[in-house]
């Protein structure tokens, strides 16, 4: 299994609503047009890792991602789809990670903030200022373990001491896994 399978992490989704954007570990070869989220007006989502609620089918699909490792900027060889919805309280991500060898997914249950690069995980880096200097991040391992913290681009450092009240659930599938992740808006830190 290549590093990419284990590191579906630093890719740009483009500017998101309210000026928030995902920080990138790799530069995009071409500009990505602004992307949008679906406004959720129904009852709060019950996180179960399944993307079977009707609103997920209505949310825009973001699927243009690039490698960070082993070759920064190369188009990702395996498909990952991200959908974003927002309600009054949170950003809610629905992620579908396809894998041609799902039996090789490294889904290790670990303590909080112990999701490391030797495991399969999805990571989201949010850069509320849009300056690409600092970001808040969350990693969700394929077994459902969480790690969160802050990232500094200046020294390429990840600090796992902050906790952002993020909730997530994972569902293993025949061809990969899916993740539902709820990130409270109140936890986004603006400089």
What do the predicted segments below correspond to?
Residues 26-191:
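Structural preference for beta-rich elements and adjacent junctions enriched in aromatics
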Residues 21-25:
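N-terminal signal peptide c-region/cleavage motif recognized by signal peptidases
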Residues 2-13:
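Bacterial N-terminal signal peptides that target proteins for export
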């Amino acid at each position: 299994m290549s590093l990419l399978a284990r590191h579906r992490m630093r890719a740009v989704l483009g500017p998101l609503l309210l000026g928030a954007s995902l920080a990138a570990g790799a530069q995009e070869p071409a500009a990505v047009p602004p992307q949008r989220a679906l406004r959720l007006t129904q009852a709060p989502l019950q996180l179960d890792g399944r993307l079977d609620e009707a609103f997920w089918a209505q949310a825009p699909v973001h699927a243009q991602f690039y490698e960070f490792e082993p070759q920064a900027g190369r188009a990702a060889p395996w498909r990952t789809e991200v959908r974003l919805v927002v309600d009054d309280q949170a950003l809610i991500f629905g992620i579908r990670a396809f894998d041609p060898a799902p039996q090789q997914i490294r889904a290790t249950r670990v303590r909080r903030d112990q999701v490391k690069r030797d495991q399969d995980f999805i990571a989201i880096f949010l850069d509320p200022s849009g300056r690409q200097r600092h970001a808040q991040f969350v990693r969700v391992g394929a077994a459902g373990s969480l790690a969160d913290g802050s990232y500094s681009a200046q020294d390429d450092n990840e600090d796992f001491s902050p906790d952002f009240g993020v909730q997530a659930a994972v569902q293993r599938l025949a061809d990969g896994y899916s993740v539902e992740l709820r990130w409270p808006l109140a936890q986004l830190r603006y400089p």
